[in-house]
Every structure is written in structure tokens, then in C-alpha cells.
Amino acid sequence: MTVQMEYEKDVKVAALDGKKIAVIGYGSQGHAHAQNLRDSGRDVIIGVRPGKSFDKAKEDGFDTYTVVEATKLADVIMILAPDEIQQELYEAEIAPNLEAGNAVGFAHGFNIHFEFIKVPADVDVFMCAPKGPGHLVRRTYEEGFGVPALYAVYQDATGNAKNIAMDWCKGVGAARVGLLETTYKEETEEDLFGEQAVLCGGLTALIEAGFEVLTEAGYAPELAYFEVLHEMKLIVDLIYEGGFKKMRQSISNTAEYGDYVSGPRVITEQVKENMKAVLADIQNGKFANDFVNDYKAGRPKLTAYREQAANLEIEKVGAELRKAMPFVGKNDDDAFKIYN
């Protein structure tokens, strides 16, 4: 199925005009949505628990409230807290303060699609999901364009939910470069699959396996790091800019020939079957339930995974090599952290 890209000219209704907007959470996506909407002339307040995000929102000039207060004041409530805390946040502080005719939005369909959050039938439920991290959503807006976004409607109580979703996307700058309509099911399942099988899980496992093959064969860890990790950005940038075609036009004939000959030996039909199993666990809710249950138990699995990953040899080698490469950029964890 193909979908048609939409732009600012296709946003026919200024559905957010006269609406009080509450952005719940002021982390990676929250600060970007809030600041872009404010700069687009919208009436935005912040709802967040006390802490660094609360202080930062006030410092940035927003009227900042508790989540309960912000929900009571708002017509449109966008929940941009981390996925794992949204259910308890919604049930304790948002749901009791919703009114008929309100709209509730998300930037990812996780909690709605898997029914961890159930919104009353008299409230709209929409989505605006920019295809990029918050700092990029903000920076590109300030530069005069934006990041493409997906939009969706899960529940249309007022008949205006699609207009709200599209106008929100316009307000954050996404309609300048393109909007795609989707569903909560499609966005959630595709997003999780992309993260797990390719962009995060698949990629890091591939890099680590390549590093281990080289070092176990007696090659220097530092050289292995450059070959399987450091040069990854160069290749990904070419694919990002012009697809496989541009990448293959830009590399040597030797590298291109090796691409065709050896790629299928690594990513075999069995790997594809494994990917299908990953997708099945997403579709049937197994991954979602495992993730949420781990959070409710205090994150024992996630903590163990993080500790294991931090002790990988490739991480230790990379940390030392990057000290001599200031051109790779400052390692600023706070720039990407989601608080509260």
C-alpha cells in the first residue's frame, strides 16, 4: 500500500486556534514540540513532575504546572513522557481530569495500541510522530524547515481529531517537509520492528559480531573498531542521502563487489526468519508486556542488559580511540536525556 505525502497546503483547518495546549513532559520530544508550537503562535503550557524538566521549562519561559493542573487547564493534552511511565502517569494524574471534547495526543502509539492506556470515548485520540529525535525537530524548525512526521487518529469523538493531528504537525514544522497518514497499529509495530531488528538491535549485534570475528582471528582491536564501527557513519550517510545506489556509486569497485557477494552470506534467509519472529513478538504484544513488566519490577532486565553492554570490549576500545578524535563530536548525554 502506498501513501501520499501531505504538506502545509493540505492542512486546511487551524484546529488548534483558541485551544489551550498542554505538553506533558519536557524531555527530548517535549521541549521540541512545546517550543515549536509556541513559535508557531500556539498557546502552550507545560505539565511535568518536579525536577530538572520542571525547572528547565520555567527557565525557557513556559507557564509550568503539575500534570494535574496542566490537564485541567488544557483543551489538548500531548503526552510526551517516556513510554514506560505513561500508563501510571495517565491513570493517576491525567485521566481523572479529562473533560468531554478534550483531545489527547501521543508521539508514539505504544500505550494506546497495546491498550495500557484507555481514553474515554468522548475524548479525541491523535498522534504526531516526528521521524527524528527532539533536538533535530527543534533545530530544523529554527532553520526554516523541519522533520517529516506521521500522523494518525485512534479515536474521533468530536469529528475534529484529524484536523487537530494535522495542525499539530504543522505547528511543529513537520508539514513543511511532509506528513504521512498512518494508524496507531502500523506506526507502533513498524517503529518497534525497525528499532529492534535493524536500527538498534540488528545494527549493534552486527557490529559486535564483526568486531569479535576480527579480534578472535588475531586482528588488533583498534583496527577492528575502525573497520566495523567508525566507518559505519560514512556508509549510513551515503545511504541516507541517496539510497543504496549512491552508496555503491561512492565506494570502490572492490567494496561494491564484496557487498553483492558477501552480504547475502551474512544476512541469510534464516536471519529473515528470525526477523519475522521478532515482528511476531511485537504484533502479539509479547515484547510490550515484557518491557512494561520489567519496568514495574524495577527494571532488573534492562539494568542487566545495560551493564553487560557497558562491559563489551568494543565499547572500551572505542572510548579510548574517540579521545583522540575530537572531530567526532562532544559526548553530551544530557542533550538526549528524557527527564521525569
Curated annotation (Swiss-Prot):
Residues 183-328 form the KARI C-terminal knotted domain. Mg(2+) 1 binds at residues 191, 195. NADP(+) binds at residues 26-29, 49, 53, 83-86, 134. Substrate binds at residue 252. Pathway: Amino-acid biosynthesis; L-isoleucine biosynthesis; L-isoleucine from 2-oxobutanoate: step 2/4; Amino-acid biosynthesis; L-valine biosynthesis; L-valine from pyruvate: step 2/4. One of its GO terms (biological process) is isoleucine biosynthetic process. It is an enzyme of class 1 (oxidoreductase). Keywords: Amino-acid biosynthesis, Branched-chain amino acid biosynthesis, Magnesium, Metal-binding, NADP, Oxidoreductase. GO terms for molecular function: ketol-acid reductoisomerase activity; magnesium ion binding; NADP binding. Its EC number is 1.1.1.86. The keyword Zinc-finger does not apply. Its cofactor is Mg(2+). InterPro entries: 6-PGluconate_DH-like_C_sf, KARI, KARI_C, KARI_N, KARI_prok, NAD(P)-bd_dom_sf. The keyword Coiled coil does not apply. Belongs to the ketol-acid reductoisomerase family. This is Ketol-acid reductoisomerase (NADP(+)). It comes from Streptococcus pneumoniae (strain Hungary19A-6). The lineage of its organism: Bacteria, Bacillati, Bacillota, Bacilli, Lactobacillales.
